[in-house]
Amino acid sequence: MKNIYPNELKKSLMQKLHYFYIFLGEDFFLLEKNQDMILNFAYKKGFLEKIIIDVEKNQDWKKIILFYKTNNLFFKKTTLVINFLIKKLNVILIQNLNKMFSLLHPDILIILKFNHLSRFIQKNKSLKEFKNYNIVSCFTPYNLNFINWIKYEIQEKKINIEEKAFFLLCKYYEGNTLFIYKILDMLFIIWPDTCITEKKIKKIIIEFFDVSPSYWINSIFQGKTEKSFYILNIFFKKKYNPLILVRSLQKDLLQLIHMKREKKISIYVMLEKYNIFVTRRKFFIKAFNKINNDSLLKAIQILVKIEVNIKKKYNNYVWNQLQELILILCN
């Protein structure tokens, strides 16, 4: 099994275009970007046709069988994208996947996209054949993987940026692949032949602020105090409605409290039960293990007080209380 990260895909394709790729991960932006890159390289190699088959239920596998049956010796080179949207893979689908490897053909380039099933695929021992093929990582990158990806994109766009400005970008936008990509495009357009400083990045962050409350909550759940303060400060400068922050955090904290009470049930089962988005589950798991019950209850009490202060229009005091919340939950 060869894992190819987003910053390595172009180089890999330039070396050799393979006829079978497996996409693991659920980052929508990376899924689309990596797919487009392979499709472009494939087109240049003569794969002029593209077929997309969505597998939403077991019966949809018949569409794949039909695709192979209806193609003859004279059909054009084709890229077949199989997009798994089904909730679970059963035994029959796993067997069909294993049989698929016997159908591989040099004139059919296959992209298998597993989306939310990716973790299951990684752990499943029944899919032994997968280890022989290229796996393209479409998981949202974090830490070093995120830094490497941003470095690659900056080099591709030929952006000149100071080290401090670069790390501010990484620190602030980590986990938000689509938005940072848009920011990089913006930097290239605004300052094409200029060294981008930390001051310019700070200006961009404030002027083009487009972050949801969940992004702020994720940073709290990660225990990143400084980043949480930074995001909160931008919410304050932008005169964001603090009640939205309160309600969003309140909802997530109450879910954490309920999860902690269900001691006999696995955290993974609970995440499924409460319909926590796949992209946010790692943050909930970290908070579940890190934040104790006393801190959670104290935070809920403060949130109630904040809501009262919002109704009384004690707005400046509200933001101080939100800072206090960050300290309680991050430490």
From Swiss-Prot:
SUPFAM superfamilies on file: P-loop containing nucleoside triphosphate hydrolases, post-AAA+ oligomerization domain-like
Gene Ontology CC terms, in alphabetical order: DNA polymerase III complex
Molecular function GO labels: DNA binding; DNA-directed DNA polymerase activity
EC number: 2.7.7.7
Keyword Transferase: yes
Leader sequence residues: none
Broad enzyme group: transferase
One Pfam family linked to the record: DNA_pol3_delt_C
Keyword set, alphabetical order: DNA replication, DNA-directed DNA polymerase, Nucleotidyltransferase, Transferase
Keyword Kinase on entry: no
Catalytic activity as recorded in UniProt: DNA(n) + a 2'-deoxyribonucleoside 5'-triphosphate = DNA(n+1) + diphosphate
GO biological process: DNA-templated DNA replication
Purpose: DNA polymerase III is a complex, multichain enzyme responsible for most of the replicative synthesis in bacteria. This DNA polymerase also exhibits 3' to 5' exonuclease activity. The delta subunit seems to interact with the gamma subunit to transfer the beta subunit on the DNA.
Similarity remark: Belongs to the DNA polymerase HolA subunit family.
PANTHER family in alphabetical order: DNA POLYMERASE III SUBUNIT DELTA (PTHR34388:SF1)
NCBIfam families: holA
Quaternary data: DNA polymerase III contains a core (composed of alpha, epsilon and theta chains) that associates with a tau subunit. This core dimerizes to form the POLIII' complex. PolIII' associates with the gamma complex (composed of gamma, delta, delta', psi and chi chains) and with the beta chain to form the complete DNA polymerase III complex.
Protein's UniProt name: DNA polymerase III subunit delta
Organism: Buchnera aphidicola subsp. Acyrthosiphon pisum (strain APS) (Acyrthosiphon pisum symbiotic bacterium)
Primary gene name: holA
